[in-house]
Amino acid sequence: MAFPRLFSPLRIGPLEARNRIVFGAHFTMFSEPARTWGEPGFHGERLGRYVEDRARGGAGVIIVGQTQVHPTTAYQMTNNAAAWDEAAVPHFRRVTEPIHRHGALAFIQLAHNGGVNFGAWSKLPVWAPSAVVNSTEAPKVLERHEIKELVEYFARSAKNAAAGGFDGIEIHAAHGYLIHEFLSPRSNQRSDEYGGNLANRMRFAVEVLTAVRAAVGPTVAVGLRLVGDEEQKYGPGLTADDAAAIAARFAALGLVDFLNVSVGISGIGMVRPVYAPHLLGVYAAHAVKQAAQNVPVFAVHRILLPDEAEGILERGEADAVTLVRALIADPEWPNKARDGVPHTIRRCTGNNQGCYGNLTQNLPITCVTNPAVGRDAELGLGTLTPAAISKRLIVVGGGPAGLEAAWVAAARGHRVTLFERGDRLGGKIRLAQMLPGRSELSDFADWRIGECERRGVEIRLNTEATANSVLALSPDAVIVATGGRATKFGTSKFFPMPVAGSEQDFVIDHEQALIRADSLGARVIIFDAVGHIEAIGLGELLAARGTEVTVVTTLPMPINLDRETMGYALPRAVQAGMRWRPNTALGAIGDHAVTLVDTLSRQFEQIADIDTVVIRTNGLPNDELYFELKDRMPKVMRVGDAVAVRYADRAIFDGHMAGRQV
């Protein structure tokens, strides 16, 4: 076996997992909403199908999350799931039965989000141990009778979960949520028996664990999602050593069957983007493991490859690995590793756009690289069935949309030829991966190229497809994936375009700037009318090379980036020397000069001696071939940026659906 430690069984209290791969708890917003939108609902069929694919894909433990234990914590997301109501029990079975059907253990994460909550819809006060603000509103300090009530609700929720078929309970004591707040001296400033020294700060957690164990009995595993390090740079906070001390006490009390160790606090470091190193939380898991030798410890955070997971276990840093985004991207990650074909794993790139990015907009999660996420019943494992008739298909364009369409159609038995006018496949992914810290995005293209090769797609590089050359091959269907083009004259929701003077030769679009980064001159102005990564990334790239570069935008921040990505990308660029000018408009472009307008003060500023002005605005589709073909063939589809210039997740989804529709 390729990864013997990873695929060895693991004892977790009264249970045995078939391997050491844990699909970790996370928000999905796949719960079935209540009759009144905004009220908490229950887990159901959509979540059941989603977790079933991860069980079918080979994970040993599936931790369903996050599930709320009390009305005061049920409104952090629009579509939360409740556990305290006995009505949840049959809904739980709709999740546990599919997991068990494929031989995995079904765990559930029970949580009270404490001070991270807010009462915008519920109007309920935020409950926290102390008057320490941990979200957008100040909390109510918990009274003793309310603490007792919460202990009872945790136990009631656990009892319901066990009745619904869950094999294990994970109590959330991390990410800045309520039990974590009690554990930390940063957020627990109480002077009663629940505050002060470590034993007192642990008291609430001990009471919860004791009550939960009594509620579920000896056949159900009980453990913690434990804070491993708060990563507080500017004040007191729990460190890995503190986490080890806490873990040792829990282990000595015999209250935990496992410890799932993560670092950071909700909203500032929980879902690390592509810029973050792999294995970034392993040090904390290792510290906990050394302190709690007899308790299985799970490591988490950016563990993406089977080699990395096996190494953690081999070095004794943890007993199991918790994967979330890696299994969102590819549910079959475990089976592919077990079967000795890890090179076929569709990797998580840390893009964050569809998973964490959607959650921050109160939308169900998706995945840039896996179009099936959230649509698992329709597009998940086992749904890509052979076509009734094998057809001759031409795909024009070798970007992510075209590659996705090609491999999906070939997997269904069609005979596929892909034309790419350039000498390399990947399309605009190849530009995106040139931005600093974003090289891992290459897997969007590389995995699809591999699938095309494995499925027998004929690839013709350096071939410009025309309507006549396509028709000469007598295809049954054509998918036009010719992409889009950047332009300095595009439109923007945030600023009237084009900018006066942008027709001049020293004014270029952002793609030209990236290709010609070495020859833009000493002083560059970048105007960002979109609010995504391109302007910031290009600014960092140029600043690191010694260019005096200023990024100007009318926006207060890059609003189309999730806050985790923005929290890395913007500081990186500024620290490299990029000047950042938000709330600033590009008024006009003169002869190697620009006029800037502060949108708040309305003050003007003239800047001269500019070598290059770069404009990042919305692009235009390359749709000419589609319109030449659409009336000359019965089956012509266009996908991705050839429809409208959007993001990679839309392009890949378009390509996937087109490949299924041939």
What do these predicted regions represent?
Residues 267, 327-330, 424-426, 487, ...:
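Short gly/pro/ser/thr-enriched loop/turn and capping motifs at secondary-structure boundaries
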Residues 415-455, 530-584, 643:
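Rossmann-like dinucleotide-binding cores of NAD(P)H-dependent redox enzymes
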Residues 209, 378-388, 411, 415, ...:
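Flanking helices and flexible, charged tails adjoining ferredoxin-like Fe-S electron-transfer domains
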Residues 290-296, 315-320, 453, 520-523, ...:
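Short, surface-exposed connector motifs at secondary-structure boundaries
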Residues 1-396, 400, 404-411, 415-416, ...:
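Flavin-dependent oxidoreductase catalytic cores
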Residues 390-419, 461-474, 481-498, 503-561, ...:
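Rossmann-like dinucleotide/flavin-binding elements
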